[in-house]
Regions:
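Structured, non-catalytic alpha/beta "coupling" segments that mediate domain-domain communication
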Residues: 116-117, 217-221, 244, 636
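Basic/charged alpha-beta structural segments of nucleotide/phosphate-handling enzymes
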Residues: 28-188, 203, 378-385
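Acidic-histidine catalytic/liganding microenvironments
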Residues: 97, 215, 835
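Low-complexity, compositionally biased segments
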Residues: 80, 91-142, 146-149, 228, ...
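Coupling/hinge elements of helicase-like and P-loop NTPase modules
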Residues: 90-93, 235-266
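Anion-coordinating catalytic cores for phosphoryl-, nucleotidyl-, and glycosidic chemistry
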Residues: 1-52, 57, 61-64, 209-210, ...
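Conserved helicase NTPase motor core
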Residues: 128-239, 272-275, 506-507, 671, ...
Length: 895
């Protein structure tokens, strides 16, 4: 830490007792390093006092800081007391006040008069609109903006006055209050101040430093470098060049220090990386180049805080790791769960009868849970998925989740106050669970926020709706972060850019060195236009760019090995453009820069099929399978041997998933089950016209029974596409019944023999004495004019029911998935031939497709060959399945 070492040696040369000094720093991060340096120098006296410049300004102002939720509530109370138009409620107020408050703080910090800026904004809008007739409608956008600044000229002065009455102050007001006291403070204080490593000052901070310098009660140590200090074009030196012109720096007091470190030899590598997270994958390769494997002089600087989790994933081999940066609260799972809880409450206000499953499931997954709660949640999800419940009734939710420790959070709250109490209690319970440190901090932040909101609401008598509370919490989540602090003296440092101030590292690795990240560019949320900010000396994005330029150059000026990574892919707000700071050092510096292009290391997805060897265990299972072979097993094998292996041999099943729209499979089941109910009543009868006409009238009743069989809720079919699917299913059933009715009207004799006829133990010989046994169900068996019809219902269209089999293709004929319908019908034909009760009847097999139900049954036809030839091909297929030398190989579909 070269710069800090230099300061300490300078101070020790002046006074061996450092307790005489107050050391003022931009942030608290360097304090621990200063203490280490003092220890290394065997300093045994009292330590100096350490302050950030904000703390010193606060001390001088002597006002109580107020920010965040307490400030928002107090400010709204003032705003509503003024009866301004429009009379925004608290939720509307929260949409504009946080941004305005930042602007107001900027005005108070940088301008001579906040009233002048506010009046200027109002006058500016009036001038823009003087020649336009805005009419009487207050909703015209420009008129609303004009009214806004008119209101702010009333509201903000009153807010300042009310805050001052309580000795409360925003950060801008603290600066304004300190400004009036600085001269007296500098004159009367007996203390000595040392300002270290500053770059940009607010006017009040500058006045404080210069006043103390004038009274010889301060000294300043700057960390400048000739590379950007002497070159007027370099924005990094903008503020430091201005400081050097202060009259306080003269022959008796030199401007300290301007080094020449940037131009010293150093290795700089620029990495063009394809992908944001891919940058983190490069880190292990960079670490290999670092000789000191303790990484004690290495910093990884994340310009995008969202890369922290991915960075930690690749650093598992680093023994000592120190994180010093803020991680946004909004990126943590508990934060997402809290946001979802408030969204759920808002939905419950709209829908008083049921819960949408997608509103509930993520909450249950993301909230920390006990072992008991986890079991309750798993059972709940299993039952909801099994029954395909999209909208869960309140009664059912309580029935299935009644034992959940936080069930109250999922129910409609009686009031926001009661709900806040429940949230506070829940946070307390969660902290007793086994959760990691980050989640513990996450929960603690929210517990504190809920307490603040509850305590602050009481004196203001503000009526808070759940929607308003949601906005308040979301504002809090988006503005807060968890600050990580570890052991900074050991190991690898992971930091944000601001945390690097005053610190120097031999090896520096910066990620996301993209335009828009470094510098941030024109991305400020502000109501004050650029030209007005410039006119009143408020900081614009140009000043912010200069500040970030200084941080960048200062960090790398003392480094020996610099690695700059940027994401070259354009996605969302990222343009894929490298930071102009990289371009500057490429074009303007004397350093040789090595450029590397890192493509995404992931290989393209290969289409290599899965292959399962038929081991002895698999063969044993196949032997067991031979006792229960169904036609659907063989069609499954034709479609994909791996699916057959998993579902029919290993007996695995797909996980139940909730269908918001009825799937093709369940649409088929709905029609199938309905027809089963219709014809079950007619089984054993020779049908009459009246039978079928009565059945047509009762279709709705049969469909409802089918819905129960599917374990679906009736509400599932009440709207949207599912309502249409049900209507189509009804039409299909009607078409089937009408087709049968038409047959009878034409004088045909139709008898329903059986429905869902189960068969098993129908032996089918293989080679030698080997055999398999067929089992399964036939959807419908009827007799039409004495001919036995074997009917299989299909949702799909009919395909390839004409068999052309001969000696040349007999073995391979049914090894084609396009012929699976004919294969199934041939097996049914064989089975029925071997059922004694059907001996002597002519047999016809066919498919009745729901896709064209009016057509009726389409029969299997043999252009070449016969059923015996067909069964030879079936035998060949079964032998292939059983053959130990033929592996199960995945069929990869190409579309």
């Amino acid at each position: 830490m070269k710069f800090l070492n230099k300061i300490i040696h300078e101070l020790l040369a002046q006074n061996t007792d450092l307790s005489a000094f107050n050391i003022i720093l931009p942030g608290k991060r360097p304090i621990v390093f200063i203490r280490q340096i003092l220890e290394e120098n065997n300093y045994s006296g009292f330590l100096p006092n350490f302050f950030t410049v904000e703390e010193l300004i606060n001390k001088i102002a002597d006002q109580q800081p107020i920010q965040g939720i307490p400030l928002w509530l107090f400010s709204f109370d003032v705003y509503r007391s003024l009866n301004l138009i429009p009379r925004d409620d608290f939720s509307d107020f929260l949409k504009w006040f946080p941004t305005l408050q930042k602007d107001w703080d900027d005005i108070l910090k940088f301008s001579d008069s906040d009233q002048a800026v506010l009046q200027y904004m109002f006058d500016e809008e009036r001038i823009k609109e003087w020649a336009q007739d805005l009419g009487e409608d207050d909703d015209v956008p420009r008129k609303k903006f004009l009214n806004f600044w008119q209101n702010m000229n009333v509201f903000l002065p009153v807010l300042k006055e009310r805050l001052q009455e309580k000795n409360w102050a925003t950060s801008g007001m603290i600066h304004e209050a300190a400004k009036a006291k600085i001269v007296d403070f500098a004159k009367n204080t007996k203390e000595q101040f040392v300002f270290c490593g500053f770059n940009a000052f607010t006017p009040v901070e500058e006045k404080l430093v210069r006043s103390l310098l004038q009274w010889n009660k301060a000294q300043c140590f700057f960390q400048a470098d000739r590379y950007y200090f002497d070159d007027e074009r370099q924005e990094a030196g903008k503020f430091l060049r201005n400081h050097k012109t202060w009259k306080e720096f003269d022959d008796n007091r030199a401007f300290q220090w301007i080094e020449d470190d940037f131009n010293q030899p150093k290795k700089i590598k620029v990495y063009e990386v394809s992908g944001n997270v891919t940058q983190t994958k490069v880190l292990p390769e960079i670490f290999k180049e670092i000789n000191n494997k303790t990484y004690s002089n290495t910093a990884v600087v994340l310009l995008d805080e969202n890369l922290l989790p991915a960075s930690l994933d690749v650093m598992h081999g680093v023994d000592n790791l120190n994180i010093t940066m803020g991680f946004p609260l909004k990126n943590l799972s508990f934060s997402n769960a809290v946001k979802r809880l408030f969204y759920l409450q808002k939905q419950l206000e709209k829908n008083k009868s049921s819960y949408y499953y997608r509103d509930v499931f993520p909450i249950l997954e993301e909230l920390p849970k006990s072992v008991e709660d986890e079991q309750i949640i798993n059972d709940f999800k299993a039952k909801v998925e099994e029954r395909n419940i999209v909208y869960i009734s309140k009664k059912l939710l309580h029935e299935l989740l009644g034992g959940l420790s936080y069930i109250g959070l999922l129910q409609k709250a009686a009031s926001t106050n009661i709900y806040l109490d429940m949230l506070i209690e829940f946070c307390q319970q969660v902290k007793w669970l086994e959760i990691d440190d980050i989640q513990y901090e996450n929960v603690s932040h929210f517990e504190n926020a809920f307490r603040i909101i509850k305590n602050q609401l009481t004196p203001y008598n503000i009526e808070i709706k759940m929607e308003t509370l949601e906005i308040l919490i979301n504002q809090y989540i988006n503005s807060e972060s968890i600050d990580f602090q570890g052991e900074p003296l050991r190991g690898l440092q992971i930091m944000g850019l601001l945390e690097t101030r005053l610190l120097n590292f031999e090896n520096v690795i910066l990620l996301s060195v993209n335009e828009g990240k470094l510098p941030l560019g024109n991305s400020q949320n502000t109501y004050i236009p650029f030209d007005i900010r410039r006119f009143f000396d408020l900081h614009t994005f140009l000043e912010n760019d200069s500040i970030y330029a200084y941080h960048f150059y200062r960090l790398i000026q003392d480094a020996q090995n610099v690695h700059l990574l940027y994401n070259a892919l354009s996605s969302g707000v990222n343009t894929g453009e490298k930071s102009r700071f990289i371009t500057q050092i490429e074009m303007e510096s004397s350093h040789e820069i090595e450029h590397l292009i890192i493509e995404n290391s992931s290989e393209p997805i290969t289409t290599k099929p899965i292959e399962i060897t038929k081991t002895q265990i698999v063969q044993d299972r196949l032997q067991k399978w031979k006792g229960k072979v169904s036609a659907s097993h063989l069609t499954s094998y034709l479609y994909n041997p791996i699916d057959f292996y998993l579902s029919k041999i290993l007996n695995t099943s797909e996980t139940d998933e909730i269908e918001e729209e009825l799937s093709v499979k369940n649409y088929g089941n709905l029609v199938h089950y309905s027809l089963q109910e219709v014809y079950e009543v007619l089984k054993g009868k020779v049908l009459k016209e009246s039978d079928l006409k009565n059945s047509v009238k009762a279709i709705d009743q049969y469909i409802n029974i089918a819905i129960e069989k599917l374990k679906h809720q009736p509400e599932f079919y009440e709207k949207g596409m599912n309502y249409i699917h049900k209507a189509i299913a009804k039409k299909v059933i009607e078409n089937v019944l009408n087709h049968d009715l038409e047959l009878i009207k034409q004088g045909n004799k139709l008898e329903i023999v059986d429905i869902e006829r189960k068969f098993e133990n129908i032996d089918f010989p293989l080679d030698g004495n080997d055999k398999i046994s067929f089992m399964g169900y036939i959807d419908r068996i009827d007799k039409l004019n004495g001919t036995l019809r074997i009917i299989d219902y299909k949702t799909a269209k009919i395909k390839n029911l004409t068999v052309k089999i001969d000696q040349d293709n007999v073995d391979e004929y049914f090894h084609n998935s396009d012929r699976k319908q004919a294969l199934q019908l041939c097996i049914y034909h064989y089975v029925v031939q071997h059922l004694p009760e059907f001996w002597g009847f002519p047999i016809e097999t066919g498919i009745w497709s729901f896709a064209d139900a009016k057509k009726g049954m389409v029969s299997l036809q043999f252009d070449k060959g016969n059923i015996d030839d067909a069964m030879k091909s079936v035998r060949s297929l079964i032998l292939e399945i059983l053959n130990p030398d033929i592996n199960f190989v995945e069929t990869i579909k190409t579309y």
